[in-house]
Amino acid sequence: MPGHKGRGPLGCEELDITEIAGADELYEAEGIIAQSEANATQLFGTARTYYSTEGSSQCIRAMLHLALQMRPAKAGRPVLLAARNAHKALLYAAALLDFDIQWLWPAPDAAGALCTCPVEPEALSSALDELAAEGRTPFGVYLTSPDYLGFVQDVAGLSAVCHAHGLPLLVDNAHGAYLHFLKEGSRHPIQMGADLCCDSAHKTLPVLTGGAYLHLGPSVQADEAAVRNALALFGSTSPSYLILQSRDAANAVLADGFREKLDICRWRLGMLCRELDALRPGLALPLT
């Protein structure tokens, strides 16, 4: 294995290997993959960072599985409090893991309505109080930030509410892997207080499609085996080594002046926004 024997029309077949001696194993990593993940952990400033070759969808299921494992025993039917603009991967996870969802809806006058679904800390606190009045305690709070229009939630304020209620905050940060590398300082969910977070590296970083990160904050007590088992539960036993190698190569990119390059990119985007607004006011969304 693989059947192409390292030869084929694409030209990348020689890099497409499987779990052989010296190549490590993603869900039991202790060699080169574990070392690469340790490098990513340092780059992102997290407690622990793990690789996925099946996108944030795999990470979403894994972090929800971990959150369910952390809930108190005999806590009743599990329910998750989630902003309504969640990706369908959350719905698939709810079906697989058998939990209920209590939606957080945007305010009636919120700009962007359902696509952005801004959630204020006060609204989250009220929603938690309403659930408590029903005798229900969610096993976590789930946000999508940034959303599909680039809106970033007040993760710091929302995480403070979650932690005051003893709940973990889970963030789908699929579109925001770059947020840790902003020149003015990190706006990544983990640094803002999130407990579990996923990034689709392939969306905003130089990584092959399917490459994603599962990040853990310092408050998550799950051991190494539990996290890897959670990922393995929803992943293929034949993870793509091409995707893994592209993630490792991206580590080198992130470590080599990436903040400065990202700042130049943001400046160019700002110029483009101003030019578009000059053509028609409101045509370009503001940068966040």
Question: Over which residues does each language-model region extend?
Answer:
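N-terminal glycine-rich, Lys/His-bearing helix-loop that initiates the first secondary-structure elements
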Residues: M1-E13
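Conserved N-terminal alpha-helix of the aminotransferase class I/II PLP-enzyme fold
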Residues: C12-Q58
